[in-house]
Amino acid sequence: MEPTFSLIVAIAAVTICITAFAIYTAFGPPSKDLQDPYEMHED
């Protein structure tokens, strides 16, 4: 396997992992701990 191909696969894997973690945090069980600053703000 060429080093360039290995680098591309590694970068793609890291990008996919970061995206999956962000989606899990936004919509999964940890989303219950997120706070909306606009809802908390009193006018």
From Swiss-Prot:
This is Protein PsbN. HAMAP family: PSII_PsbN (MF_00293). Pfam families: PsbN. It comes from the Bacteria. GO terms for cellular component: plasma membrane-derived thylakoid membrane. May play a role in photosystem I and II biogenesis. It is a single-pass membrane protein. Keywords: Membrane, Thylakoid, Transmembrane, Transmembrane helix. The gene is psbN. Its main location: membrane. GO terms for biological process: photosynthesis. Belongs to the PsbN family.
